């Protein structure tokens, strides 16, 4: 996301060419989950104090950020509210300028490679899974 240049693939992103960041596109229904919950989950998955890296992944393509199409003011307000919790804070927050979908072999990567590397700690993945189950239960309960 948010680099320069017209041809992008995983190999070029890994070299730092074009200054692209590895990113995930998130579409959501505000009636099912709030933006705040999504941002809370995001901050459970990253270390905002790391510059151009996340855990063992090092390089500018690993710079954390939130690149948005809408709700910029809400996102900036959230970022401002958590920034003081960290000695250093390197999370980019800016409008999405460009996004390229990764090659097919990167889609659903952990489903295809259950033992594949992921920097997100298992306890955080379980937290998100539990949260997702709770939200699904809550949303399937109709209130008349």
Regions found by a protein language model. Give the residues of each.
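Flexible coil/turn and secondary-structure edge motifs
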Residues: 1-144
């Amino acid at each position: 996301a948010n680099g320069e240049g017209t041809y992008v693939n995983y190999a070029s992103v890994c070299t730092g060419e074009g200054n692209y960041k590895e990113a995930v596109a998130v579409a959501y229904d505000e009636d099912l989950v709030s933006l705040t919950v999504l941002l809370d989950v995001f901050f459970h998955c990253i270390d905002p104090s790391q510059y151009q890296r996340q855990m063992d992944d090092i390089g500018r393509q690993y710079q954390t950020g939130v690149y948005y199409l809408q709700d910029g003011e809400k996102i900036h307000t959230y970022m401002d509210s958590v920034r003081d919790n960290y000695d250093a804070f390197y999370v980019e927050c800016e409008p999405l300028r460009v996004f390229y979908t990764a090659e097919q072999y990167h889609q659903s990567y952990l489903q295809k490679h259950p033992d594949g590397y992921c920097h997100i700690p298992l306890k955080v993945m379980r937290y998100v899974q539990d949260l997702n189950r709770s939200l699904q239960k809550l949303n399937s309960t109709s209130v008349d």
